[in-house]
Amino acid sequence: KYVYTLFPHQTQYVLDENELAIIPNSVPIKRCLLTANMETAINAMWDTLPSCGDKILIIGAGIVGLLMAYILKAIPGIEILLIDKDNRKRKMAKLFNIKFDQKIPASYQANIIYECSGNASVINELSRHIQDETTICILSWYGDNITKVRFGEEFLSKRAKIIFSQVSKVSHNRSKYWKNSDRKKLAISLLNDDKLDNLIEKNMINFYDLPKFFSNISKHKNFYCKVIDYGVKKNV
């Protein structure tokens, strides 16, 4: 059997059984590299509880943003607009039948916004696209970057709710019933769709070439999930 786990780049290690998730035969091994990102999207969904009729705005069409749109699209009657300044992402959005634009239309207002761009400065722009009591769910990690946010304007008058969806803990809306290991199994099961292979880099990077790869990271600007070959000669 093949298993999925989160672990730093090493060729050999010992883990407890509870740190592993068995990969079902229906899901290709390489596609399971999207598991952590799918868990992020699941947790954000649990944090915000979207439903039929919601108007959704997703900022950032990287892997997390696309997976967020992908699982939200399964909800009947939901409207989703995916935003990314990189027009090359339009092709990927079309593949998943997701409405795409490079800029937020001036009149567009959403009741749930998912910020997946990694750029905290976009938060101020979102103030022009909220309804009363809109929830802004931040999936990005900003590190130690500092950004000024104008909380005293639309965010205040429209009682906006801003939450950070941190994937290390299961959302409080589901923590009574779900453990991290359960959520991981759910994420893997949701990867049973061949279309998701389009998010993964076709070429693999040899484990021993990683230092060279990261030293030239600026040359590798595509958003695809990278695949590392640890030298195990198996067909994945």
Question: What residues fall within each predicted segment?
Answer:
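Glycine-rich phosphate/adenylate-binding loop and adjacent beta-alpha elements
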Residues: 1-22
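Residue-level marker of beta-strand positions
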Residues: 1-3, 43, 55, 135
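Mid-domain Rossmann-like dinucleotide-binding core that forms the NAD(H)/NADP(H) cofactor-binding site
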Residues: 28-102
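Local beta-strand N-terminus motif with an aromatic residue
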Residues: 53, 109-111, 197
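Glycine- and other small-residue-rich loops at beta-strand/loop junctions that grip anionic moieties
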Residues: 57, 61, 82-83, 111-115, ...
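Glycine-rich cofactor phosphate-binding loops and adjacent beta1-alpha1 units
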Residues: 91, 96-163
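C-terminal substrate-binding/catalytic core of Rossmann-like NAD(P)-dependent dehydrogenases/reductases
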Residues: 149-201
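C-terminal hydrophobic helical "lid"/dimerization subdomain
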Residues: 178-236
